[in-house]
Amino acid sequence: MEAAAVLPRYLQLRLLLVLLLLVLLRAGPVWPDSKVFSDLDQVRMTSEGSDCRCKCIMRPLSKDACSRVRSGRARVEDFYTVETVSSGADCRCSCTAPPSSLNPCENEWKMEKLKKQAPELLKLQSMVDLLEGALYSMDLMKVHAYIQKVASQMNTLEESIKANLSLENKVVKDSVHHLSEQLKSYENQSAIMMSIKKELSSLGLQLLQRDAAAVPATAPASSPDSKAQDTAGGQGRDLNKYGSIQKSFSDKGLAKPPKEKLLKVEKLRKESIKGRIPQPTARPRALAQQQAVIRGFTYYKAGRQEARQEARQEAPKAAADSTLKGTSWLEKLPPKIEAKLPEPNSAKHDDVRLQASEGGNLTPDITTTTTSTSSSTTTTTGTTSTTSTTSTTSTTTPSPITTPWPTEPPLHPEVPSQGREDSCEGTLRAVDPPVKHHSYGRHEGAWMKDPAALDDRIYVTNYYYGNSLVEFRNLENFKQGRWSNMYKLPYNWIGTGHVVYQGAFYYNRAFTKNIIKYDLRQRFVASWALLPDVVYEDTTPWKWRGHSDIDFAVDESGLWVIYPAVDEHDETQHEVIVLSRLDPADLSVHRETTWKTRLRRNSYGNCFLVCGILYTVDTYNQHEGQVAYAFDTHTGTDAHPQLPFLNEYSYTTQVDYNPKERVLYAWDNGHQLTYTLHFVV
């Protein structure tokens, strides 16, 4: 009984709080015709009896009567009454109403007193009136029934939610248990699947390399420029293997030129050397210990061997002519060969290529004069593995004297043409402020043109990771966003160091040391090569690291690749930047056209190559930078030009030189810019 008595009191307290909120929302005086709840009046009526019908009639004072009573002009009818009308044999009725409901004048009088005595209690008095009227007119039992119903509904809802959640949890637990059982059954087969996956991956790589370097079926078997196919690229090669290949070629009976043709070529070369005025230069002493690389065994007759020995004796005279005049901080490109080139696949052509290779300072052309038959031959010298592509057989030659590291002269460098040599004006003198052409894409990216093409197509790689190459017909279409072609590459690229050259897209495959040549006309991987000595960060770059690990470049002499490698001549094993000229056909790297610079990795922002000279910008994320370092591949020397370079939007992720237009293409924080260059004439 005590608990039953306490419960209504608790409910009454909660009810008072609810009424207090209602008061705050509905402030104002309560008139007799107002209702706190829509179905309850302010008059309370009680009835007793079995057959009883009651009716309460309330006649309160009106507002006019209050004003008349206040002014002293009260009438006889100015009063309020509460009448009770009942019907029935045994019926007792009673009607009660609060005085504030019957006599509104009291409220007004009280309000005036409050305004005069305590204006701050005005709101409190209105709240008291509301509570008084609510207590008289409200059926507490009815409200209690409503509250009980709401509480029961809430309990039912909670029970249903608990039941549903428990059922779902049971289903999830059963699913997890079922999956774990399946995982246990497949655990024993995971190792086998991983090994099969690795074998399939290596097999796919070998097939791609074999397809990229396959010999055309239409090539003649007895062609002197045909080469042995070997795309595995390993270091443990048997030397007898190369000897057997060379011997098999010699057994087929290669056509040997007569001695008269050799003498004519020799006479032509001597006349060209005599026609030039040699500059007095000091010849550096060759290194005492130089490692020789055996490219293969070749069998010659006595006449041809004597001609080659004579060509070696004349090589220093040709090397002396390679020094240029000038007072700039770097030497210019070496002189060009003035002798007329003979026809390919002839005896004169073989000897001229030999003379050019023994000269040591010639820059090979980007186009080849040999037949289309090509192969890659991998040799090992110490701990460095290099891949070379030869069109003819050759003999062992010492390293060139122009580089500080022991290297070999070119086996068959292509003689640069007259127009190619004249296109290099000299060393870099100044870089103009950039010119903005468009705002396109993300913060990182690269845009470029094919310097060997006749049209003005623009190629764009948006971001530093992806597999799409977008082509635009010209600059105007690029500004309008009207692309003409979209290339979906079979392997993703990474970085911004890609180039388009001679109708192919050269890029670094993501997270590997592989470089790929993708033919844009036929849409397939034309070549695939591995850079064995590159120091590559194979972790996923979640943000731009400020550089590309493997960077391609194109200048007047051809295609280049720039990458970091360990300096084996330094005891600290620092990582330095390596510069190497590639063969565009098969991406082979030649030891004689590879230079190790003194530039440390991560010590610069961007780099570009002009006329065989590597230039680096010291920063990529500062507004004002400098071309702080330069390396000349012709002399093997470096310098610090300190030329101003402006990063207009302070986030340059690509700088590449276009030898056709002689400008730099740059991608700066989503803006496409070009820089005009000035040279020392």
Swiss-Prot record:
Residues 305-315, 333-353 have a biased composition (Basic and acidic residues). The keyword Signal applies. Pfam families: OLF (PF02191). The keyword Iron does not apply. Residues 423-681 form the Olfactomedin-like domain. Residues 216-226, 367-400 have a biased composition (Low complexity). GO terms for biological process: extracellular matrix organization. Homodimer. Binds to heparin and chondroitin sulfate E. This is Olfactomedin-like protein 2A.
